[in-house]
């Protein structure tokens, strides 16, 4: 059994997608829980929420939930008492978690849904991780704010996942939260990455579907960092040429793009002030050695910065996320 445990933890630490099936034995229960979800009844549960509910109250042990392919139309909540959960899909294109709530829609209880209640999946737990899954809000292009994932917990990690929707797709909520997204695909229309958390995006593909804004950070003034995009690719639909890298949801929004490909959909000036010139004085927008058709630093707004070689050294992954990422540090 000792050998099998070592193999499991080695595989779980790899960054590329791996599907692992491990039998749940009496001895393994002492160290972790492994559940499976399958809509056809071949797993431990038919729905993901059932698997979440099976996680022990105030859990302190690793729980792995393996999800078989399927479209799981559920409004999912991972409670704050359900820490240390790992969600693993069989295939990121065919393991789809989706729902269709949006602002203005009535909930089953008769309440009017708003941005903060429109989520398809809300994570309140700490130490959550996911890989090989599509997270989606399929409310539609004209539905308004419709969150696919609201991530509130601390030390959350997504690897090789897809986030699909339109406006307000990925809500990185909670100013005390630290989050890491590695090799993920995120697409949307307006402010589709937004919130107050400290977040590092590593080698992600960010795709715009409308002439609007990629980010809407609300970084608190006392937080040194907000969003960092490192070695990412920014693309847009072919008809787009007026997308901004971000606009400040709050005055001290902090967003940095480092070594990123900036597609021609991004407007030359790069950034938006959200129609408030006072934001010139407080926003913390910067870039470093980006490349691509819309990466010319000479055309950027004067109130955004280009980092120096010395300044960029501060953007150290382990330092940025206070050492919760186990992988080797990569300094830009």
Residue ranges and their predicted role:
Residues 1-30:
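Bacterial Sec-dependent N-terminal signal peptides
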Residues 25-332:
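Sequence-level preference for short, compositionally simple segments enriched
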